[in-house]
Design a protein with these regions (language model features):
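Active-site HxH/HxHxD metal-binding segment of metal-dependent hydrolases
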Residues: 33-36, 42-122, 207-211
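Metallo-beta-lactamase
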Residues: 32-33, 94-98, 126-214
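Short Gly/Pro-enriched turn/cap motifs at secondary-structure boundaries
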Residues: 6-7, 110-112, 132-134
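Conserved S/T- and glycine-rich ATP-binding loop of Class I adenylate-forming
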Residues: 18, 58, 133
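Residue-level detector of beta-strand structural context in well-folded domains
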Residues: 16, 113, 118-119, 141, ...
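Conserved beta-strand hairpin/beta-sheet module of binuclear metal-dependent hydrolase folds
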Residues: 1-48, 142-153
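Short acidic-hydrophobic surface loop/beta-edge motif
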Residues: 6, 18, 119-125
Length: 214
């Protein structure tokens, strides 16, 4: 599995392009805002002769789908959003105002098939399963590849921290409970690719993350 991270937009969100030897790929959380960021992602896909087959959202905060209109136009892939987060996605203008307290351009194309706990995403010879992880948003999820021991955690789990819960729909203890269950379930050598910041491992977070003690 090949994982390419693109830190994008003013909030330094991590967009991931995940591919394998078949050259099929999934795009996770394309928050590209500036034209040069969008071009950089497209160039990587083109230079590596990749075929994107899905655009997945870990949750529906605007900084994670700023580039969704570009991906939909270029590859014909509407973003797939966790079902409980559809109200956030559909009313993005109100979401932006409530979080930033001012308006900013954020085009959101019609969403594709909802992501549910039963969803299984396949690309090439790999599959991603959905692990619900609410708390940062009502419908936040992680995407897990058991074969490669890789977790894409969105804004639920960060290196030595967790996602904010003071936005509309957030709940601190819901998130902590979900993450404590998560780290008890997954192998310690699972690599965690978060929505912002550096990658980590489940073992490191079990050992060092102050929100997950006990």
């Amino acid at each position: 599995m090949n994982i390419k991270s693109f830190p994008v937009n003013p909030l330094s969100e991590n967009c991931y392009v995940v591919s394998d030897e078949t050259r099929e790929a999934v795009i996770i959380d394309c928050g590209a805002y500036y034209d040069d960021e969008k071009a950089m992602i497209a160039k990587y896909i083109r230079d590596n002769d990749l075929k994107p087959v899905a655009h997945l959202l870990t949750h529906a905060h605007f900084d994670h789908f700023w580039g969704a209109d570009y991906i939909a136009e270029l590859y014909g892939l509407p973003p797939r959003c966790p079902q409980p987060d559809r109200p956030l996605y559909d009313d993005v203008d109100e979401q932006v105002r409530s979080i930033l307290h001012y308006s900013i351009r954020c085009a959101n194309p019609p969403a594709g098939e909802d992501i549910t706990p039963e969803s299984v995403i396949t690309f090439g010879s790999h599959r991603l399963t959905v692990i619900p992880c609410p708390g940062h948003t009502p419908g936040g999820v992680c995407y897990y590849c058991e074969e490669e021991k890789v977790l894409f955690s969105g804004d639920s789990l960060f290196q030595n921290s967790i996602g904010r819960t003071d936005f509309p729909g957030g709940d601190l203890w819901t998130l902590i409970d979900a993450l404590k269950a998560l780290i008890k379930t997954l192998p310690g050598d699972t690599t965690v690719y978060p929505g912002h910041g550096l990658k980590t491992t489940i073992a490191a977070e079990h050992r060092n993350n102050p929100y997950l003690f006990g």
